[in-house]
Amino acid sequence: MTGHAPLVGVIGGSGLYKLEGIEPVESLNIDTPWGRPSSPITLFKLPSGPVVAFLARHGVSHQFTPSEVPSRANIAALKKIGCQVIIAFSAVGSLREEIKPRDIVVPSQIIDRTKSAHAMFGEPFDTELTGLVTKSIKEAVTGFEMNDRIGVHAEKVAICMEGPAFSTRAESNMYRMFGGDIINMSVLPEAKLAREAELSYALIAQITDYDAWRESEEPVTVAEVMATIAANVSVSNRLTLTILDEVHNAVAKGQLKTCKGTMEYSVMTKKEMISEESKKTLSFILPYFS
């Protein structure tokens, strides 16, 4: 691997399979106790010099459905190569009139509607990181052409449902009553696993549609979603050029309180009662279990 470990990892969602406009310097195939990640990890050199890591959540050919994504391997591999922070992109549906297609949301909370078995936690997103990312995005979009069409929203609630699937109209309205603002299929278990690996995590959610709750519209179709995803990809690439420098510098200077050390006393089982095999597996991401 290159001499400088990447502090920041980027997970690309649907349509974002590489970072445009940034020089790729190395491709890594990382083996983890949970298998290989969904794509090779590509290291990109930012114009200012630092290296960042990128992987495609669904694979470079979008071969993994939301329920098939090897999230444990993805998170473990990014942790292994030195990442302390993850910026994840995802295509999402809007559950609110004021959050329009092509808008950007940096959520602060999640409601879990998946079938995963991980325990919930109080703050699924790093609050300092989401604040920095939101500020950086707002500054970036002011320079975009037709920037008035791209709203930026923070302090919103993401619903994560089991996928691949789209909501019925009744389900969509139920999620609105729950207090959800956006809906997707990928933020979990990703956010939970990032916390377990002591990685700060923030989601940049790009709106593709209004889900199915609007009575005045036909239910969302795959064609509709894919058309908006294509329009969002160029925005994603322009945002990465702006925000990755800021996030890297904040981590390098110690301005973000990362999650390092938060899991050391979070396992209730006495260390001597944990099997050697489990310790070996855990030590891949948490060295104090070795």
Curated annotation (Swiss-Prot):
<dbReference type="Pfam" id="PF01048">
    <property type="entry name" value="PNP_UDP_1"/>
</dbReference>
<dbReference type="GO" id="GO:0019509">
    <property type="term" value="P:L-methionine salvage from methylthioadenosine"/>
</dbReference>
<feature type="binding site">
    <location>
        <position position="14"/>
    </location>
    <ligand>
        <name>phosphate</name>
    </ligand>
</feature>
<keyword id="KW-0963">Cytoplasm</keyword>
<protein>
    <recommendedName>
        <fullName>S-methyl-5'-thioadenosine phosphorylase 2</fullName>
        <ecNumber>2.4.2.28</ecNumber>
    </recommendedName>
</protein>
<dbReference type="GO" id="GO:0005829">
    <property type="term" value="C:cytosol"/>
</dbReference>
<dbReference type="InterPro" id="IPR035994">
    <property type="entry name" value="Nucleoside_phosphorylase_sf"/>
</dbReference>
<keyword id="KW-0328">Glycosyltransferase</keyword>
<feature type="binding site">
    <location>
        <position position="185"/>
    </location>
    <ligand>
        <name>substrate</name>
    </ligand>
</feature>
<feature type="binding site">
    <location>
        <position position="186"/>
    </location>
    <ligand>
        <name>phosphate</name>
    </ligand>
</feature>
<feature type="binding site">
    <location>
        <begin position="57"/>
        <end position="58"/>
    </location>
    <ligand>
        <name>phosphate</name>
    </ligand>
</feature>
<comment type="function">
    <text>Catalyzes the reversible phosphorylation of S-methyl-5'-thioadenosine (MTA) to adenine and 5-methylthioribose-1-phosphate. Involved in the breakdown of MTA, a major by-product of polyamine biosynthesis. Responsible for the first step in the methionine salvage pathway after MTA has been generated from S-adenosylmethionine. Has broad substrate specificity with 6-aminopurine nucleosides as preferred substrates.</text>
</comment>
<keyword id="KW-0660">Purine salvage</keyword>
<feature type="binding site">
    <location>
        <begin position="90"/>
        <end position="91"/>
    </location>
    <ligand>
        <name>phosphate</name>
    </ligand>
</feature>
<keyword id="KW-0539">Nucleus</keyword>
<comment type="subunit">
    <text>Homotrimer.</text>
</comment>
<keyword id="KW-0808">Transferase</keyword>
<comment type="pathway">
    <text>Amino-acid biosynthesis; L-methionine biosynthesis via salvage pathway; S-methyl-5-thio-alpha-D-ribose 1-phosphate from S-methyl-5'-thioadenosine (phosphorylase route): step 1/1.</text>
</comment>
<dbReference type="InterPro" id="IPR018099">
    <property type="entry name" value="Purine_phosphorylase-2_CS"/>
</dbReference>
<feature type="binding site">
    <location>
        <begin position="209"/>
        <end position="211"/>
    </location>
    <ligand>
        <name>substrate</name>
    </ligand>
</feature>
<dbReference type="GO" id="GO:0005634">
    <property type="term" value="C:nucleus"/>
</dbReference>
<dbReference type="GO" id="GO:0017061">
    <property type="term" value="F:S-methyl-5-thioadenosine phosphorylase activity"/>
</dbReference>
<feature type="site" description="Important for substrate specificity">
    <location>
        <position position="167"/>
    </location>
</feature>
<dbReference type="InterPro" id="IPR010044">
    <property type="entry name" value="MTAP"/>
</dbReference>
<dbReference type="GO" id="GO:0006166">
    <property type="term" value="P:purine ribonucleoside salvage"/>
</dbReference>
<comment type="similarity">
    <text>Belongs to the PNP/MTAP phosphorylase family. MTAP subfamily.</text>
</comment>
<dbReference type="InterPro" id="IPR000845">
    <property type="entry name" value="Nucleoside_phosphorylase_d"/>
</dbReference>
<feature type="site" description="Important for substrate specificity">
    <location>
        <position position="222"/>
    </location>
</feature>
